[in-house]
From Swiss-Prot, chain B:
Gene behind the chain: mt-co3
Phylogenetic placement of the source organism: Eukaryota, Metazoa, Chordata, Craniata, Vertebrata
Topological domain spans for side Mitochondrial matrix: 1-15, 67-72, 153-155, 224-232
Family under the similarity heading: Belongs to the cytochrome c oxidase subunit 3 family.
Mitochondrial intermembrane side: 35-40, 106-128, 184-190, 257-261
EC number: 7.1.1.9
Bilayer topology term: Multi-pass membrane protein
Assembly and interaction partners: Component of the cytochrome c oxidase (complex IV, CIV), a multisubunit enzyme composed of 14 subunits. The complex is composed of a catalytic core of 3 subunits MT-CO1, MT-CO2 and MT-CO3, encoded in the mitochondrial DNA, and 11 supernumerary subunits COX4I, COX5A, COX5B, COX6A, COX6B, COX6C, COX7A, COX7B, COX7C, COX8 and NDUFA4, which are encoded in the nuclear genome.
PROSITE patterns the record matches: COX3
Recorded superkingdom: Eukaryota
Catalytic EC class: translocase
Any single GO BP term: mitochondrial electron transport, cytochrome c to oxygen
Keywords (A to Z) from UniProt: Membrane, Mitochondrion, Mitochondrion inner membrane, Translocase, Transmembrane, Transmembrane helix
Protein known as: Cytochrome c oxidase subunit 3
Amino acid sequence: MAGRHLLRACTALRLVNQNVAVRPLQRTMGTLKGIPTDDEQATGLERRALQALKKGKDPYSMLRPMEYAGTKAEPHIVPGISTKRLVGCLCEEDNTAIVWFWLHEGDAQRCPSCGSHYKLVHSELPH
Amino acid sequence: MTHQAHAYHMVDPSPWPLTGAVAALLMTSGLAVWFHFHSTTLMALGTVLLLLTMYQWWRDIIREGTFQGHHTPPVQKGLRYGMILFITSEVFFFLGFFWAFYHASLAPTPELGGCWPPTGITTLDPFEVPLLNTAVLLASGVTVTWAHHSIMEGERKQAIHSLTLTILLGFYFTFLQGLEYYDAPFTIADGVYGSTFFVATGFHGLHVIIGSTFLAVCLLRQIRYHFTSEHHFGFEAAAWYWHFVDVVWLFLYISIYWWGS
């Protein structure tokens, strides 16, 4: 009985396939030589990260952070997704004691130890 | 839904590290059981569990990277570091066996006749099958580089052809070494010569088989469109491993087959 069902399914499939245009065996990609590019095939977080980089943005902090003078005129720009963010200041190079403080939105704050300026700038959560 | 603000991969919980550890336990204790009680059941069970672990763990990595996109550039960089460190550890593994060989052969003891090769050992002619094997592996290094460039340039057919050729050359090497082992005039039990020869070349042969398997998996993935022209780290890792295997053979050939004959 199972054999009869299988035979019926096969004949039905064959009839359906006869009405469908024959697809070429080799999948054509944008690159006609057959290997896809990241642009065509990357997916998920990898795709989002690569597409953002192409637009000059770095929402996933993959690149080295920009360096700022830390003065009143050129404060350290700290991107944040909320109204406050923790900042750890290494006042001088090779310092082992990190100065931690909450940076709130609004006017630039100064590090309680070395006085360099930090400003919270709102940025969207990447999604 | 909460999304991460970093580019790293926080891996989902997985049972494979545990099954791998259990497999290691069963294989080692199974080895002891085999030695003392003449039963291979426990060891065989451990081996099966190990193979299942490897298959499922690496299948999951392919799913996470290729199908789900978790292998961002920083993640890929970490994988590169990982493979380089692993190959470095393998270099040290072989270094030990070369140390053993040179320790025995640079100052041969009176038991060997004070000479190298030791008295009574008929060595293999380095200019016969071993030289052919050297040519085979060097050629496979060329074909695997050809495969890499084909992938980078988007040439699907050439990539498949050159990768297949590389694997066939690997099989040819293994086949020739098998014949050499079978027809060798000395065995592993023939003093320190036999020990150093078969342990060093034997582990090398095992690594050739591992490398060929890795390349074969890459061939399967390439046929199924896993690789892109920019992102194909699985293939690069296999190619690095294959070059490492080739270099180890060159050292083996020069030290044991040629200088040691």
